[in-house]
Amino acid sequence: MKSVRYLIGLFAFIACYYLLPISTRLLWQPDETRYAEISREMLASGDWIVPHLLGLRYFEKPIAGYWINSIGQWLFGANNFGVRAGVIFATLLTAALVTWFTLRLWRDKRLALLAAVIYLSLFIVYAIGTYAVLDPFIAFWLVAGMCSFWLAMQAQTWKGKSAGFLLLGITCGMGVMTKGFLALAVPVLSVLPWVATQKRWKDLFIYGWLAVISCVLTVLPWGLAIAQREPDFWHYFFWVEHIQRFAMDDAQHRAPFWYYLPVIIAGSLPWLGLLPGALYAGWKNRKHSATVYLLSWTIMPLLFFSVAKGKLPTYILSCFAPLAMLMAHYALLAAKNNPLALRINGWINIAFGVTGIIATFVVSPWGPMNTPVWQTFESYKVFCAWSIFSLWAFFGWYTLTNVEKTWSFAALCPLGLALLVGFSIPDRVMEGKHPQFFVEMTQESLQPSRYILTDSVGVAAGLAWSLQRDDIIMYRQTGELKYGLNYPDAKGRFVSGDEFANWLNQHRQEGIITLVLSVDRNEDINSLAIPPADAIDRQERLVLIQYRPK
């Protein structure tokens, strides 16, 4: 009966966090709008080999993540939930692997369920796991690889070992097809410390080639297909997207070595109080084979991405699966022996909630700021934000009422965030970061436009997805579309600022021409170097400028 209650509670938890509130949040640009539009175009064109964005070749990532996103929109439609369905599914599958692997290591159903709940309620997992990017997919394949390698090394027969290594190769291959060759580097680095400490080199060398073969066979069909269709894909993807992006001096998203320290701290909420103890207990029990394995999968990817010059918070998502397992194991031990860490965790959540309440007041219309985040007419959004932090503090307090029994309710601290964050986004943020909001406000003007030009790739993708058209033209800036725009068949998809006046004269009689420009909040749009327009509609950070036929 208790198991049934636990399962009902888990399904309710998943529904409240990962299903019900997702449609209430508009898509963010540039990431969500980009991946939404790539998948929409894949469905519309039927081309499942070469990824395109705005009708242009887009070689930033391989294909597998787009496949999953496309299936999400195919099943649930071109809406907010459909766009995010793939990442939610991948996150829930990862949690299922966490449950299964924890159960296999410790043979404790309660511990296994707790590990999954901790994983799903971690701030970084929830933030990225409900956000339409490719990182939840690669995290799933890496965690699947973690489980596969353990299965292979624990098997007692050659058939079991062979099956485990073949499965490992498939997960690595799918990882390569999702985000590239990092899906090979991370597993190798993660298993080496365990293999060294356990002296299991023999099994690795005897059976490892099976993983190599299955990985190659997994990637080969699509790899050959895209090489035939687009011979320069692999050169661009390997050299630009891997070497330049991560290792060279001009790497994208450069950050210092310690960049991930605050990410780990913030990402571990609402379980931050367990982080030091879980890592220390793991190190203290390093003679235990499973503990060393989980520690290695937590720390080695973190060190690898810290050394790389290019960094983003999403890169270390896979580290939190083994970390959640270590946290769950440590939490149960602490509840039995010394609940100090659980009390500290409760106080951290109270402090975070109270700090959020105060910060919300400071940036509200009634606070001391001259330019508040929310305007007076957005009072309900301020109250939503207060509710988010109030619930966080409340559940933090509740975990302290009988800490040995109630500590696990920390999983409900982000409940207000899950349910209300979509209703608390300030208009000033929505106007710049949510193209759907802009389209909603300007739908009647945008719909009949013969040509639409914009100076932002993220906005262009949002316009294309919302309006169901892929012919948006880039104006002044090429951004990440620079490579695709260099192809001969992309001629006419970019108009520079100097060319715009002549281009306008040539195309004006074909129909309404609309410019959508990103501007600074205090920028005078009359100072823009453009021909006089027939209509201007400013929505704070985005401006719609129209030219009608003469």
From Swiss-Prot:
What does the record give as the reaction this protein catalyses?
A: 4-amino-4-deoxy-alpha-L-arabinopyranosyl di-trans,octa-cis-undecaprenyl phosphate + lipid IVA = lipid IIA + di-trans,octa-cis-undecaprenyl phosphate
Record InterPro entries: ArnT_tfrase (IPR022839), Glyco_trans_39/83 (IPR003342), LipidA_mod_glycosyltrf_83 (IPR050297)
Q: What residue intervals traverse the membrane?
A: 7-27, 81-101, 113-133, 134-154, 165-185, 204-224, 263-283, 288-308, 315-335, 346-366, 382-402, 406-426
> Membrane topology per the record?
Multi-pass membrane protein
GO aspect biological process, one term: lipopolysaccharide biosynthetic process
Supply the Pfam families for this chain.
PMT
Query: Does Cell inner membrane appear among the keywords?
Result: yes
> Could you name the Gene Ontology cellular component terms for this entry?
plasma membrane
Query: What HAMAP family does the record point to?
Result: ArnT_transfer
| Name the UniProt record assigns to this protein | Undecaprenyl phosphate-alpha-4-amino-4-deoxy-L-arabinose arabinosyl transferase
**Natural source organism:** Escherichia coli O17:K52:H18 (strain UMN026 / ExPEC)
